[in-house]
Amino acid sequence: KYERGNKMREAVKKYIAEHYEDYVKDLEALTNIDSGNGDREGTEAANKFVAEKMTAIGATTEFRYNDRACHLISRLKGTGKYTILLVAHVDTVFKKGEAARRPFRVDENNFAWGPGVGDDKATVVEVIYGLEALKAAGFDNFKEIIYYTNGEEEGGSKTAEEIVAELSQQSDFAIIMDVARPNWGIVTQRK
């Protein structure tokens, strides 16, 4: 059992290392899409990008809209027992035009910069590559992975709350894939 787990871990690490440049290109593409909170067109463009990637690995996708945003629910079927909900967001706090004014770049220290790159676009792309790596390694020991990319996390909305409540009822486990804080700090509430 442990040997199989070690082989799986090594296969995932190898996949991630081999696809790092692709990851950076996809992060650049997503970061350079203006998708500020309340920008329905921008959040739709960002979630269409995510949907294309998720469809390529075998997921089904469903878009949900309100007057302010586009939300995406992607579902990847497995052969296991448990359903896992992953939640991230494609919206940012930046207004339309910020991506052109301050486009994605990687500095001399290999840090990525751009509107929303750290909250939460890097995570959005990391989840996609993580799922690709698991699939490439042959891992499907889950009933379903539901990947919800929220279009209104920064400002919150009734639509997002309803979607999370609905998907939570369908899931055995949930992981919020938002950005971490220094020294392993976590955000538990907003003031």
Where are these regions (language model features)?
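Short, Lys/Arg-enriched N-terminal segments with co-localized hydrophobic residues
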Residues: K1-K7
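Acidic/His- and Gly-rich active-site-bordering loop/insert found
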Residues: R9-V117, A136-N141
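Acidic/histidine-rich catalytic neighborhood of metal-dependent amide-processing enzymes
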Residues: D120-R190
